[in-house]
Amino acid sequence: MDPGTLNSVINRLLEAREKPGKIVQLSETEIKQLCFVSRDIFLRQPNLLELEAPVKICGDIHGQYPDLLRLFEHGGYPPNSNYLFLGDYVDRGKQSLETICLLLAYKIKFPENFFLLRGNHESASINRIYGFYDECKRRFSVKIWRIFTDCFNCLPVAALIDERIFCMHGGLSPELLSLRQIRDIRRPTDIPDRGLLCDLLWSDPDKDVRGWGPNDRGVSYTFGSDIVSGFLKRLDLDLICRAHQVVEDGFEFFANKQLVTIFSAPNYCGEFDNAGAMMSVSEDLTCSFQILKSNDKKSKFSFGSRGGAKTSFPYPKVKSILSSQNSKEYN
Protein backbone atom coordinates (compact mmCIF):
# COMPACT_ATOMS: atom_id res chain seq x y z
CA MET A 1 0.00 0.00 0.00
CA ASP A 2 1.72 3.19 -1.11
CA PRO A 3 2.14 5.98 1.48
CA GLY A 4 -0.02 8.41 -0.48
CA THR A 5 -3.01 6.07 -0.49
CA LEU A 6 -2.53 5.22 3.18
CA ASN A 7 -2.37 8.89 4.19
CA SER A 8 -5.45 9.63 2.10
CA VAL A 9 -7.38 6.86 3.86
CA ILE A 10 -6.34 8.13 7.30
CA ASN A 11 -7.18 11.73 6.44
CA ARG A 12 -10.64 10.80 5.21
CA LEU A 13 -11.30 8.73 8.31
CA LEU A 14 -10.21 11.59 10.57
CA GLU A 15 -12.49 14.08 8.81
CA ALA A 16 -15.33 12.42 10.72
CA ARG A 17 -14.10 14.28 13.81
CA GLU A 18 -16.03 17.30 12.58
CA LYS A 19 -19.24 15.34 11.96
CA PRO A 20 -19.67 12.48 14.45
CA GLY A 21 -21.56 9.60 12.88
CA LYS A 22 -20.66 10.58 9.32
CA ILE A 23 -20.11 7.61 7.01
CA VAL A 24 -16.60 7.71 5.54
CA GLN A 25 -16.25 6.77 1.88
CA LEU A 26 -13.50 4.22 1.27
CA SER A 27 -13.17 2.08 -1.83
CA GLU A 28 -13.29 -1.70 -1.80
CA THR A 29 -9.74 -1.73 -3.16
CA GLU A 30 -8.50 0.44 -0.29
CA ILE A 31 -10.13 -1.81 2.29
CA LYS A 32 -8.62 -4.91 0.71
CA GLN A 33 -5.19 -3.28 0.82
CA LEU A 34 -5.62 -2.41 4.51
CA CYS A 35 -6.47 -6.04 5.27
CA PHE A 36 -3.73 -7.61 3.15
CA VAL A 37 -0.90 -5.35 4.33
CA SER A 38 -1.84 -5.40 8.02
CA ARG A 39 -2.25 -9.18 7.87
CA ASP A 40 1.36 -9.52 6.73
CA ILE A 41 2.52 -7.26 9.58
CA PHE A 42 0.58 -9.29 12.17
CA LEU A 43 2.20 -12.49 10.94
CA ARG A 44 5.68 -10.95 11.00
CA GLN A 45 5.22 -9.91 14.61
CA PRO A 46 4.88 -12.50 17.41
CA ASN A 47 1.61 -13.89 18.75
CA LEU A 48 2.74 -12.74 22.21
CA LEU A 49 3.84 -9.14 21.71
CA GLU A 50 6.70 -7.95 23.93
CA LEU A 51 6.27 -4.20 24.35
CA GLU A 52 7.93 -1.40 26.28
CA ALA A 53 6.25 1.41 28.18
CA PRO A 54 5.10 4.13 27.75
CA VAL A 55 1.91 2.83 26.20
CA LYS A 56 -1.82 3.58 26.37
CA ILE A 57 -4.12 0.57 26.68
CA CYS A 58 -7.71 0.58 25.39
CA GLY A 59 -10.47 -1.99 25.77
CA ASP A 60 -13.54 -2.81 23.69
CA ILE A 61 -14.60 -0.28 21.02
CA HIS A 62 -17.39 -2.23 19.27
CA GLY A 63 -17.90 0.03 16.29
CA GLN A 64 -18.39 3.20 18.37
CA TYR A 65 -16.24 5.23 15.99
CA PRO A 66 -16.86 8.72 17.45
CA ASP A 67 -15.67 7.41 20.81
CA LEU A 68 -12.52 5.94 19.25
CA LEU A 69 -11.74 9.37 17.82
CA ARG A 70 -12.29 10.95 21.24
CA LEU A 71 -9.81 8.51 22.76
CA PHE A 72 -7.18 9.60 20.25
CA GLU A 73 -8.10 13.25 20.75
CA HIS A 74 -7.24 13.04 24.43
CA GLY A 75 -4.61 10.31 24.46
CA GLY A 76 -2.72 11.74 21.50
CA TYR A 77 -2.82 10.63 17.89
CA PRO A 78 -0.21 8.07 16.75
CA PRO A 79 2.75 8.24 16.77
CA ASN A 80 2.68 10.88 19.54
CA SER A 81 1.46 8.11 21.83
CA ASN A 82 1.99 4.36 21.67
CA TYR A 83 -1.17 2.25 21.80
CA LEU A 84 -2.24 -1.28 22.64
CA PHE A 85 -5.87 -2.20 21.91
CA LEU A 86 -7.28 -5.32 23.56
CA GLY A 87 -9.75 -6.42 20.87
CA ASP A 88 -13.46 -6.29 20.03
CA TYR A 89 -13.29 -3.57 17.40
CA VAL A 90 -16.40 -4.63 15.49
CA ASP A 91 -20.06 -5.57 16.10
CA ARG A 92 -22.92 -3.89 17.94
CA GLY A 93 -21.93 -0.28 17.13
CA LYS A 94 -22.94 1.60 13.99
CA GLN A 95 -19.49 2.12 12.43
CA SER A 96 -17.46 -1.05 12.68
CA LEU A 97 -15.96 -0.45 9.24
CA GLU A 98 -14.61 3.01 10.05
CA THR A 99 -13.34 1.73 13.39
CA ILE A 100 -11.40 -1.26 12.08
CA CYS A 101 -10.14 0.58 8.99
CA LEU A 102 -8.59 3.40 11.03
CA LEU A 103 -7.00 0.91 13.42
CA LEU A 104 -5.54 -1.15 10.56
CA ALA A 105 -4.33 2.00 8.81
CA TYR A 106 -2.48 3.14 11.94
CA LYS A 107 -1.02 -0.36 12.33
CA ILE A 108 0.39 -0.15 8.81
CA LYS A 109 1.70 3.40 9.22
CA PHE A 110 3.22 2.89 12.69
CA PRO A 111 3.86 -0.87 13.02
CA GLU A 112 6.23 -0.50 16.00
CA ASN A 113 4.11 2.01 17.93
CA PHE A 114 0.57 0.76 17.42
CA PHE A 115 -0.62 -2.70 18.42
CA LEU A 116 -3.90 -4.61 18.12
CA LEU A 117 -4.84 -7.80 19.96
CA ARG A 118 -7.62 -10.14 18.94
CA GLY A 119 -10.95 -10.12 20.76
CA ASN A 120 -13.63 -12.79 20.70
CA HIS A 121 -15.59 -10.67 18.18
CA GLU A 122 -12.70 -10.85 15.70
CA SER A 123 -14.09 -14.22 14.71
CA ALA A 124 -16.37 -15.13 11.79
CA SER A 125 -18.76 -17.19 13.91
CA ILE A 126 -19.40 -14.22 16.23
CA ASN A 127 -19.35 -11.18 13.95
CA ARG A 128 -21.50 -13.08 11.46
CA ILE A 129 -24.28 -12.66 14.02
CA TYR A 130 -23.68 -9.41 15.91
CA GLY A 131 -23.53 -6.82 13.15
CA PHE A 132 -20.23 -6.72 11.29
CA TYR A 133 -21.27 -9.16 8.57
CA ASP A 134 -24.45 -7.18 7.91
CA GLU A 135 -22.54 -3.89 7.80
CA CYS A 136 -19.99 -5.29 5.32
CA LYS A 137 -22.74 -6.80 3.16
CA ARG A 138 -24.83 -3.62 3.16
CA ARG A 139 -21.97 -1.22 2.41
CA PHE A 140 -19.71 -3.44 0.28
CA SER A 141 -20.00 -7.20 -0.12
CA VAL A 142 -19.79 -10.54 1.66
CA LYS A 143 -16.37 -10.92 0.02
CA ILE A 144 -15.07 -7.94 2.01
CA TRP A 145 -16.28 -9.58 5.22
CA ARG A 146 -14.37 -12.75 4.28
CA ILE A 147 -11.21 -10.70 3.65
CA PHE A 148 -11.54 -9.14 7.11
CA THR A 149 -11.96 -12.65 8.54
CA ASP A 150 -8.65 -13.70 6.96
CA CYS A 151 -7.03 -10.64 8.54
CA PHE A 152 -8.57 -11.24 11.98
CA ASN A 153 -7.33 -14.84 11.94
CA CYS A 154 -3.77 -13.47 12.03
CA LEU A 155 -4.10 -11.02 14.93
CA PRO A 156 -1.84 -11.58 17.97
CA VAL A 157 -3.64 -12.69 21.13
CA ALA A 158 -1.57 -11.40 24.06
CA ALA A 159 1.04 -8.82 25.03
CA LEU A 160 3.65 -8.47 27.75
CA ILE A 161 4.68 -4.95 28.78
CA ASP A 162 8.19 -4.66 30.23
CA GLU A 163 7.91 -8.26 31.44
CA ARG A 164 5.51 -7.12 34.21
CA ILE A 165 2.04 -6.50 32.74
CA PHE A 166 0.27 -9.35 30.92
CA CYS A 167 -2.49 -8.28 28.53
CA MET A 168 -5.19 -10.16 26.64
CA HIS A 169 -8.84 -9.69 25.69
CA GLY A 170 -10.55 -12.22 27.93
CA GLY A 171 -8.57 -13.86 30.69
CA LEU A 172 -6.60 -16.79 32.00
CA SER A 173 -6.83 -20.46 31.07
CA PRO A 174 -6.36 -23.63 33.12
CA GLU A 175 -4.13 -24.79 30.25
CA LEU A 176 -1.79 -21.78 30.47
CA LEU A 177 1.35 -22.89 32.27
CA SER A 178 3.97 -20.97 30.30
CA LEU A 179 3.93 -17.92 28.04
CA ARG A 180 5.75 -20.02 25.47
CA GLN A 181 2.45 -21.79 24.82
CA ILE A 182 1.04 -18.51 23.48
CA ARG A 183 4.09 -17.91 21.30
CA ASP A 184 3.61 -21.39 19.85
CA ILE A 185 -0.01 -20.89 18.72
CA ARG A 186 0.09 -21.03 14.94
CA ARG A 187 -1.62 -18.45 12.77
CA PRO A 188 -3.78 -17.97 10.76
CA THR A 189 -6.36 -19.67 12.94
CA ASP A 190 -10.02 -19.42 13.80
CA ILE A 191 -10.96 -19.37 17.48
CA PRO A 192 -11.77 -22.90 18.69
CA ASP A 193 -14.68 -23.73 21.00
CA ARG A 194 -12.37 -24.70 23.86
CA GLY A 195 -8.74 -24.68 24.89
CA LEU A 196 -6.04 -22.09 25.51
CA LEU A 197 -6.80 -19.73 22.62
CA CYS A 198 -10.52 -19.81 23.38
CA ASP A 199 -9.92 -19.01 27.06
CA LEU A 200 -7.56 -16.11 26.37
CA LEU A 201 -10.37 -14.44 24.43
CA TRP A 202 -13.42 -15.58 26.40
CA SER A 203 -12.80 -16.21 30.12
CA ASP A 204 -13.86 -13.84 32.91
CA PRO A 205 -12.82 -13.13 36.51
CA ASP A 206 -15.51 -13.74 39.14
CA LYS A 207 -15.32 -12.58 42.76
CA ASP A 208 -17.69 -15.37 43.82
CA VAL A 209 -15.56 -18.15 42.39
CA ARG A 210 -12.58 -19.95 43.88
CA GLY A 211 -10.49 -21.78 41.33
CA TRP A 212 -12.23 -22.34 38.01
CA GLY A 213 -15.97 -22.16 37.44
CA PRO A 214 -18.48 -22.39 34.58
CA ASN A 215 -19.08 -19.29 32.47
CA ASP A 216 -22.60 -17.96 31.90
CA ARG A 217 -21.57 -17.10 28.33
CA GLY A 218 -21.61 -20.82 27.60
CA VAL A 219 -17.96 -20.64 26.53
CA SER A 220 -14.74 -21.02 28.53
CA TYR A 221 -14.48 -20.49 32.30
CA THR A 222 -14.65 -18.01 35.13
CA PHE A 223 -11.71 -17.78 37.53
CA GLY A 224 -11.23 -16.56 41.07
CA SER A 225 -8.74 -14.21 42.70
CA ASP A 226 -6.73 -17.22 43.87
CA ILE A 227 -6.09 -18.17 40.25
CA VAL A 228 -4.89 -14.63 39.48
CA SER A 229 -2.53 -14.52 42.48
CA GLY A 230 -1.10 -17.94 41.76
CA PHE A 231 -0.55 -17.19 38.08
CA LEU A 232 1.23 -13.89 38.73
CA LYS A 233 3.46 -15.41 41.40
CA ARG A 234 4.34 -18.43 39.28
CA LEU A 235 5.30 -16.34 36.24
CA ASP A 236 6.79 -13.41 38.21
CA LEU A 237 4.33 -10.86 36.82
CA ASP A 238 2.65 -7.88 38.50
CA LEU A 239 -0.64 -7.22 36.72
CA ILE A 240 -3.15 -8.75 34.32
CA CYS A 241 -4.85 -6.24 32.03
CA ARG A 242 -7.92 -7.39 30.09
CA ALA A 243 -11.19 -6.15 28.55
CA HIS A 244 -14.27 -8.17 27.48
CA GLN A 245 -16.77 -6.94 30.11
CA VAL A 246 -18.74 -3.71 30.47
CA VAL A 247 -17.71 -2.00 33.73
CA GLU A 248 -19.49 1.06 35.08
CA ASP A 249 -16.47 3.34 35.49
CA GLY A 250 -14.62 2.17 32.38
CA PHE A 251 -12.11 0.28 34.51
CA GLU A 252 -12.47 -2.08 37.44
CA PHE A 253 -9.95 -3.83 39.67
CA PHE A 254 -10.08 -7.44 40.80
CA ALA A 255 -8.02 -9.63 43.13
CA ASN A 256 -6.57 -6.81 45.23
CA LYS A 257 -5.56 -4.78 42.17
CA GLN A 258 -3.74 -7.68 40.56
CA LEU A 259 -6.13 -7.60 37.58
CA VAL A 260 -7.82 -4.69 35.85
CA THR A 261 -10.67 -4.74 33.32
CA ILE A 262 -10.69 -1.89 30.80
CA PHE A 263 -13.71 -1.06 28.64
CA SER A 264 -13.45 1.87 26.22
CA ALA A 265 -16.95 2.16 24.73
CA PRO A 266 -19.02 4.61 26.84
CA ASN A 267 -22.82 4.40 26.87
CA TYR A 268 -22.32 0.93 25.36
CA CYS A 269 -24.91 0.17 22.66
CA GLY A 270 -26.89 3.17 23.89
CA GLU A 271 -28.23 0.86 26.61
CA PHE A 272 -25.65 1.12 29.41
CA ASP A 273 -24.78 4.27 31.32
CA ASN A 274 -21.15 3.22 31.62
CA ALA A 275 -18.03 5.31 31.20
CA GLY A 276 -15.16 4.31 28.93
CA ALA A 277 -11.54 4.25 30.05
CA MET A 278 -7.98 4.17 28.79
CA MET A 279 -5.02 3.11 30.94
CA SER A 280 -1.74 4.97 30.51
CA VAL A 281 1.42 3.10 31.52
CA SER A 282 4.38 5.44 31.97
CA GLU A 283 8.04 4.52 31.52
CA ASP A 284 8.36 3.78 35.25
CA LEU A 285 5.23 1.57 35.02
CA THR A 286 2.96 4.01 36.81
CA CYS A 287 -0.59 3.27 35.69
CA SER A 288 -3.18 6.04 35.45
CA PHE A 289 -6.68 6.08 34.01
CA GLN A 290 -8.41 8.55 31.76
CA ILE A 291 -12.17 8.40 31.72
CA LEU A 292 -14.55 9.08 28.85
CA LYS A 293 -17.87 9.65 30.57
CA SER A 294 -21.35 9.27 29.21
CA ASN A 295 -23.46 12.01 30.79
CA ASP A 296 -26.70 11.31 29.00
CA LYS A 297 -28.27 9.42 26.13
CA LYS A 298 -27.42 12.26 23.73
CA SER A 299 -23.75 11.39 24.04
CA LYS A 300 -22.23 14.35 25.80
CA PHE A 301 -18.90 13.29 27.15
CA SER A 302 -16.40 14.43 29.71
CA PHE A 303 -12.83 13.28 29.76
CA GLY A 304 -10.56 13.37 32.77
CA SER A 305 -8.64 11.31 35.28
CA ARG A 306 -10.37 9.37 37.98
CA GLY A 307 -10.06 9.17 41.71
CA GLY A 308 -7.82 10.94 44.20
CA ALA A 309 -5.97 8.11 45.86
CA LYS A 310 -2.51 6.72 45.36
CA THR A 311 -2.25 2.99 45.71
CA SER A 312 0.47 0.46 44.99
CA PHE A 313 0.28 -2.96 43.43
CA PRO A 314 1.64 -5.88 45.47
CA TYR A 315 4.87 -5.74 43.51
CA PRO A 316 6.82 -2.48 43.59
CA LYS A 317 7.53 -2.25 39.89
CA VAL A 318 3.95 -1.50 38.89
CA LYS A 319 2.04 1.28 40.61
CA SER A 320 -1.37 2.82 40.16
CA ILE A 321 -1.72 6.59 40.40
CA LEU A 322 -5.32 7.75 40.22
CA SER A 323 -4.77 11.48 40.04
CA SER A 324 -7.58 13.91 40.62
CA GLN A 325 -8.16 16.43 37.84
CA ASN A 326 -11.02 18.63 36.79
CA SER A 327 -13.10 16.93 34.15
CA LYS A 328 -13.77 18.81 30.96
CA GLU A 329 -16.97 18.32 29.03
CA TYR A 330 -16.96 17.66 25.29
CA ASN A 331 -20.08 17.75 23.16
From Swiss-Prot:
Gene Ontology molecular function terms on file: metal ion binding; protein serine/threonine phosphatase activity
Keyword field: Acetylation, Cytoplasm, Hydrolase, Manganese, Metal-binding, Nucleus, Protein phosphatase
Localization per record: Nucleus; Cytoplasm
EC number: 3.1.3.16
CC terms in the record's Gene Ontology section: cytoplasm; nucleus
Binding site residues for Mn(2+) 1: 60, 62, 88
Cofactor annotation: Mn(2+)
Pfam family, one: Metallophos
Tissue spec: Expressed in roots, rosettes and flowers.
UniProt xrefs under Gene3D superfamilies: 3.60.21.10
SUPFAM superfamilies: Metallo-dependent phosphatases (SSF56300)
Primary location class: nucleus
Active site: 121 (proton donor)
Record's catalysed reaction(s): O-phospho-L-seryl-[protein] + H2O = L-seryl-[protein] + phosphate; O-phospho-L-threonyl-[protein] + H2O = L-threonyl-[protein] + phosphate
Class in the EC hierarchy, top level: hydrolase
Cofactor binding: number and manner: Binds 2 manganese ions per subunit.
Chain residues that bind Mn(2+) 2: 88, 120, 169, 244
Highest taxon in the source lineage: Eukaryota
Positions of modified residues (N-acetylmethionine): 1
Protein family: Belongs to the PPP phosphatase family. PP-1 subfamily.
Function per UniProt: Serine/threonine-protein phosphatase that possesses phosphatase activity toward para-nitrophenyl phosphate (pNPP) in vitro.
Descriptive protein name: Serine/threonine-protein phosphatase PP1 isozyme 7
Organism name: Arabidopsis thaliana (Mouse-ear cress)
